[in-house]
Curated annotation (Swiss-Prot), chain B:
Main location: cytoplasm
Record organism: Bos taurus (Bovine)
PROSITE patterns: GNAT
Name of this chain's protein: Thialysine N-epsilon-acetyltransferase
Modified residues (N6-acetyllysine): 29
Catalytic activity, EC: 2.3.1.-, 2.3.1.57
Amino acid sequence: MRQPSVTSFRVRPAEAGDCPEILHLIKELAACENMLDAVKLTSKGKVTVGLAMYYFTYDPWIGKLLYLEDFYVIQAYRGLGIGAEMLKRLSQIAIRSQCNCMHFPVVTWNQASIDYTHRGALDLSSEEGWHLFRFNREELMDMAGEK
Amino acid sequence: MAFVMIREAKEGDCGNILRLIRELAEYEKLSDQVKISEEALRADGFGETPFYHCLVAEILSAPGEPQGPCVVGYGLYYFSYSTWKGRNIYLEDIYVKPEYRGQGIGSKIIKKVAEVALDKGCSQLRLAVLDWNKRAMDLYKALGAQDLTEAEGWHCFRFEGEAMRELAGK
């Protein structure tokens, strides 16, 4: 696979106008496919090649946390330090916002999960036994409907 | 049986909530991890930008009894976001004092959170359970929840303290 030449990249906060691009990347991440064909390269234009979607959560034992919901770089642009730069910016945001840690979910068949542990992350599910549970809308309606 | 009411917590409940937070940590065998203060709970839950919301389960004493209402459980939650489904609610903590269990108070708290979720246009409620807490797992499964760690292999990872500062500094 020919890697596109990247002279420079920057990581910046998203704006409202980025939403169509963000949705596009979200779908890519969900599909985990190589979507190189869909990327329009121009010699002068800017291309959005990655996203990190986060919000603040709360742990009653330690306080505010930064939760990284989605983290993705288009496959053709990996290995260039873009993901690492995004993680660096996120950590800076977390520290500036008085967060004690960053949490993020990983599907354990994802090889990148091993990278995270090498960078110092802890797998809470393996270490402490936490399981993530989900109720969907139908179950919410069942629960709310019963009195 | 005493009447139990599930209501929104007020700032004045923070002392009681912290007491119950410590009890829950003790139950989860992780009590040395509780670092939070009552002051932080007040500021973070009842300041200009709330970082969490909380429901409390309150037992109302019968007429003639000397003691006032008593907080015997809580559910602490916040709003989150799924890039696939949109608005979510995350139930971070749910706890009922041991002597008040078996009366459906925990279920009442979860149902109230479900009502809030629907009211705010959320499509999912998520929560985490420790793998040895079979009683809690059984309750959530009976209410229709799916164990995503078991079914889909989702694990929760954390960067904390030194690891996070290193990431920020590089």
